[in-house]
Design a protein with these regions (language model features):
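Extracellular glycoside hydrolase catalytic/binding regions
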Residues: 1-95, 99-100, 108-139
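Non-catalytic accessory regions flanking glycosidase/transglycosidase catalytic cores in CAZymes
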Residues: 135-158
Length: 158
């Protein structure tokens, strides 16, 4: 069933990374977003180039999964690459969802594994990835406020 009043997120091949390929033959609907997944320590210029191609071709993109570690969820926390990604997303009005809000003992988790609170977290409860994410959200609050003030059902990138 087609839901014209709803936003539909469409995956792309190769773990939702081939948005450039999808942009060459997009589905002709106005309420679709194409999913992109990235992990900042693993996916760098090559995937950013694919995103830029998709945007140039007018494809509406939503990052439905990202982290600032390696794609495994472990390894280094790459804030430099993460900052580059956030700049690209913010400059192009692309929304995103971080993976993952948990206290699992892995680098991509936003909470430290020692955190047992279900809410009301202190800054020290956040993992290094979580501290970066929290600061990023606070530093870019004005961008998000502007985006929330002007929602649209037409998802096409302009």
């Amino acid at each position: 069933m087609y839901a014209p009043q709803s936003i539909v997120i469409v995956g792309t091949p190769t773990w939702s990374q081939d948005v450039d390929i999808a942009s060459s033959s997009p589905i002709e609907r106005t309420n679709l977003l194409y999913s992109l997944h990235f992990y900042a320590a693993t996916h760098k210029e090559d995937l950013q180039s694919k995103l830029q191609t998709a945007l140039t071709n007018g494809l509406p993109v939503f990052v439905s999964e990202f982290g600032i570690t390696e794609a495994s969820g472990s390894g280094i926390v790459d804030t430099t690459s993460a900052d580059t990604w956030m700049k690209l997303l913010n400059e192009n009005g692309i929304g995103y969802i971080y993976w993952n809000l948990s206290n699992k003992d892995e680098a991509c988790a936003l909470l430290r594994s020692s955190c047992t609170s279900l809410s009301d977290w202190t800054f020290d409860d956040y993992s290094p990835a979580g501290q970066w994410f929290l600061q990023n959200q606070q530093n870019n609050a004005s961008i998000y406020d502007k985006a929330a003030a002007a929602p649209t059902a037409d998802c096409r990138h302009s």
